[in-house]
């Protein structure tokens, strides 16, 4: 029971922690377009690599961050709705 309480406490702390802000020079300005599940942000092209974050609209807790050299536009992921990229 004690292990369960510790696990729940650590899980609550991890869920409440704010996401780290990316470096200002890594994010490109983007174009915001309306979508069914919310706005879709399309990153603009840059010479330097930029941070690409993919967040399905229907799953708010899922986020994948990676460095990608070119902008991407993804309208949906297996029917889950639009994603935010930029």
UniProtKB/Swiss-Prot annotation:
Give a yes or no for keyword Secreted in this entry: yes
Location of Isoleucine amide modifications: 85
Cellular localisation? Secreted
Q: Which UniProt keywords apply?
A: Amidation, Neuropeptide, Secreted, Signal
Q: What is the residue range of the signal peptide feature?
A: 1-16
Q: Name one GO biological process term.
A: neuropeptide signaling pathway
Q: Which residues does the propeptide include? A: 17-50, 63-75
Q: Name one GO cellular component term.
A: extracellular region
Instruction: List all membrane-crossing ranges.
Output: none
**Origin, by domain of life?**
Eukaryota
Protein name (record): Neuropeptide-like 3
């Amino acid at each position: 029971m004690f292990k369960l309480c510790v696990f729940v406490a650590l899980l609550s702390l991890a869920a409440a922690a704010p996401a780290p802000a990316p470096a200002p020079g890594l994010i490109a300005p983007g174009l915001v377009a309306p979508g069914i599940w919310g706005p879709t942000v399309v990153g603009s092209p840059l010479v330097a690599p930029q941070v690409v974050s993919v967040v399905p609209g229907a799953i708010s807790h899922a986020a994948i961050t990676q460095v990608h050299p070119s902008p991407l536009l993804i309208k949906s992921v297996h029917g889950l709705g639009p994603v935010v990229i930029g």
